[in-house]
Curated annotation (Swiss-Prot):
Keyword Membrane: yes
Gene Ontology CC: one annotated term: membrane
Alphabetical UniProt keywords: Membrane, Transmembrane, Transmembrane helix
Organism: Mus musculus (Mouse)
Membrane topology of the entry: Multi-pass membrane protein
Name this protein carries in UniProt: Transmembrane protein 19
Gene: Tmem19
Membrane-traversing stretches: 15-35, 49-69, 78-98, 218-238, 257-277, 313-333
Localization (cell): Membrane
Record-stated family: Belongs to the TMEM19 family.
Length: 336
C-alpha cells in the first residue's frame, strides 16, 4: 500500500468514525427526549424538553470537551468531567451554558497566553492548563448542583431574573452566575497579573510585599482583571437573555446581570485570596527561587498554613460567593 492509499484509508476511517459518533449522539438525544415525553405524560407538572434542545445539549459539550482535550486545556478525566458539567448546564438553561463557555474558553486562552513567562514563575505550570476532574469538580460542582435544583424548581428553559415574580429561581440563576463569575475572576487575575503587573504583590492579610505566585498576593492589575473576568461572564449571560427570553418587556430590567457578574468576579477573587493567604501554604524554594505550596526543609515559609490546597480554596470560594451575593443582590435588584 502506497503512502497516498494509506492517507486515503485513514481519512475514510476518520469519516466513518465521525458518522458513527454523530449517529450515537442523535440516538442518545432521542432517547432522552422519549424519556422526557414519557415523564411529562405521567407527571403533569414536568415540562417536556424538545428534541433539538436534547441534541444541542449533547453535541455541543462533546465537541467542546474533545476540543479542550485536543488543545491540552483538559486531560482525560477533565474532559469527561467537563462533559457532564456542560451537559447539565446546557439542558437547564442556555444562559448557564454561555456563561460556562465564556469562563472556560477565556480562561483556557489566558492560561496559554505568555506561557513561557509563567513557566519561569510557577513551579506547577502545565502547558495549556491540562485541568483534571478535580479542578473541573471544584469549579463546576456548585454550578452543576444549582442547575439541577433550577430544573427541579423551574424546569429546563430560560427565564428573566425577577425576584418579585420568581424569587427562588432568580436566586438560583444569580447564584450560579456568581459561582462562574467568581471562578473566572480568580483565573483571570492569576493568569494576567503575573505577566502585566509591574509592582510586587501584597499579601491581602498584612499588606506586606510577597514574591510573585504567593497564595493570597494581590495587585491592582489582578483585581482589575478579576473585575473584567466576572463582567465578561455576566455580559454573556445578559446577551443570552436578550436572545432567548420572550417576556423581557414585562419583567424586571436584566442589565444589572452585567454589573453583578463584575462584582462576583472581584469579590470571588478577594475571598480566594484571603483563604489562600490564611489556609494555603506558600513558601520560597531556596534552590529554584520559586514559590511552592508544599513545606519542605529547603522551603522558607511566606504565608498560610497547609490546611487547604488550591482546588479546595477554589471550591470554598465558589460556595461562599454563590451563597452570599445572590442574597445581597435580591434586596437591591430592580423591580418591574
Amino acid at each position: 500500500m502506497t503512502d497516498s492509499d494509506d492517507t486515503t484509508c485513514k481519512r475514510y476511517i476518520k469519516m466513518i468514525t465521525n458518522i458513527v459518533i454523530l449517529s450515537l449522539i442523535i440516538c442518545i438525544s432521542l432517547a432522552f427526549w422519549i424519556m422526557s415525553m414519557t415523564a411529562s405524560t405521567y407527571y403533569g407538572n414536568f415540562r417536556p424538553v424538545s428534541p433539538w434542545r436534547w441534541l444541542f445539549s449533547v453535541v455541543v459539550p462533546v465537541v467542546i470537551a474533545c476540543n479542550g482535550f485536543k488543545k491540552k486545556s483538559l486531560d482525560h478525566s477533565g474532559a469527561l468531567g467537563g462533559l457532564v458539567v456542560g451537559f447539565i448546564l446546557t439542558i437547564a438553561n442556555f444562559s448557564f451554558f454561555t456563561s460556562l463557555m465564556t469562563f472556560f474558553l477565556s480562561s483556557s486562552k489566558l492560561t496559554k497566553w505568555r506561557g513561557n513567562i509563567k513557566k519561569q514563575l510557577d513551579s506547577e505550570y502545565k502547558e495549556g492548563g491540562q485541568r483534571n476532574w478535580v479542578q473541573v469538580f471544584c469549579n463546576g460542582a456548585v454550578p452543576t448542583e444549582l442547575a439541577l435544583l433550577y430544573m427541579i424548581e423551574n424546569g429546563p428553559g430560560e427565564m428573566p431574573i425577577d425576584f418579585s415574580k420568581q424569587h427562588t429561581a432568580s436566586w438560583m440563576c444569580l447564584s450560579l452566575l456568581a459561582a462562574l463569575a467568581s471562578s473566572a475572576g480568580d483565573t483571570w487575575a492569576s493568569e494576567v497579573a503575573p505577566v502585566l503587573s509591574k509592582s510586587s504583590p501584597r499579601l491581602i492579610t498584612t499588606w506586606e510585599k510577597v514574591p510573585v505566585g504567593t497564595n493570597g498576593g494581590v495587585t491592582a492589575v489582578g483585581l482589575a482583571s478579576s473585575l473584567l473576568g466576572g463582567t465578561f461572564v455576566g455580559l454573556a449571560y445578559f446577551l443570552t437573555q436578550l436572545v432567548f427570553v420572550n417576556d423581557l418587556d414585562i419583567s424586571a430590567p436584566q442589565w444589572p446581570i452585567i454589573a453583578f457578574g463584575g462584582v462576583a468576579g472581584l469579590f470571588g477573587s478577594l475571598v480566594d485570596s484571603f483563604l489562600g493567604a490564611t489556609m494555603q501554604f506558600s513558601g520560597l524554594d531556596e534552590r529554584t527561587g520559586l514559590v511552592v505550596s508544599s513545606p519542605t526543609q529547603e522551603t522558607k515559609h511566606i504565608a498560610g498554613k497547609p490546611i487547604l490546597d488550591n482546588n479546595a480554596v477554589n471550591l470554598f470560594s465558589s460556595v461562599l460567593v454563590a451563597l452570599l451575593l445572590p442574597t445581597a443582590a435580591s434586596g437591591f435588584w430592580p423591580r418591574e
